[in-house]
Regions:
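ATP-dependent adenylate-handling ligase core
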Residues: 1-14, 47
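Residue-level marker of alpha-helix boundaries and capping positions
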Residues: 3, 63-64, 161, 181
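A generic alpha-helix signature
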Residues: 3-7, 99, 161-165
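Catalytic subdomain that performs nucleotidyl-dependent activation
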Residues: 8, 18-27, 31-126, 134, ...
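Amphipathic alpha-helical segments that form well-ordered structural scaffolds
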Residues: 11, 76, 169-173
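Broad structural signal for hydrophobic residues in well-ordered alpha-helices, predominantly aliphatic
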Residues: 15, 108, 173-174
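AMP-forming adenylation/ATP pyrophosphatase catalytic core
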Residues: 42, 55-58, 102, 120-211
Length: 211
């Protein structure tokens, strides 16, 4: 399964646009959410990455099967004699997702039979939190004064933001500037720069210096 916003979806979206189709439907299901949470935890991801899979995106991707688990979908297909195609790579344990699916989660279910439900609820709760942060970030963007001619932002405006909101603002600005991924350590250094003026500067992507 591809991640939301994955480049793998671009050819499908382009094909849909050429044929004036309203959306592209993918086969993501409830198990994909649980697997995704475990994978992100193993990678040390933060709340945004743990927030699960959206039922629909602004790009035109819809995921109508998210309410159901894979066994439920397969049972329905068999009952209605509808054939389906299995991706042969789904059995390859060389992929992290497959190790989570075939090894990690089955072992977790031995101790916690409802682990899938717990993981999905966690993802849903974090998604709700992220939606709230997104709304607050939009409001903050309205009162944070514009970039100065030298590319700066008034320090007092950034100091007024709580850290969780400021982190998201910094990451959004980095993405807008084409800086790319900002690590957790870099984010912490940026907070210290804003709050304590120490360090005096932080370098991102080897060429962007914030001070």
């Amino acid at each position: 399964a591809t991640r939301p916003g994955s480049p793998a979806h671009l050819p499908l979206l382009e094909l849909a646009a050429r044929h004036s189709l309203a959306a592209v439907a993918t086969a993501h299901h409830r198990d994909d959410i649980a697997e995704g949470v475990v994978m992100q935890l193993l990678r040390g991801a933060g709340p945004r990455a743990l927030a699960g899979i959206a039922a629909a995106t602004s790009a035109g991707i819809v995921r109508p099967l998210l309410p159901w688990r894979r066994p439920e979908i397969v049972a329905w297909l068999r009952a209605n004699r509808i054939p389906w195609i299995e991706d042969s790579s789904n059995a390859d344990l060389g992929h992290l997702r497959n190790r989570v699916r075939h090894v990690v989660l089955p072992e977790l279910r031995r101790s916690a039979p409802r682990i899938d439900d717990h993981l999905v609820r966690l993802a849903d709760a974090l998604a709700a939190d992220e939606a709230l942060f997104a709304a607050e970030l939009e409001q903050a963007a309205a009162w944070i004064r514009p970039w100065a001619p030298d590319g700066g932002v008034p320090l007092a405006d950034l100091q007024a933001l709580a850290r969780p909101l400021r982190s998201r603002w910094l990451h959004a600005q980095a993405a807008r500037a084409g800086i790319g991924r900002v690590t957790r350590r870099q984010t912490e250094l940026l907070h210290r720069l804003i709050e304590e003026l120490a360090p005096r500067s932080v370098t991102l992507a080897g060429r962007w210096r914030l001070r």
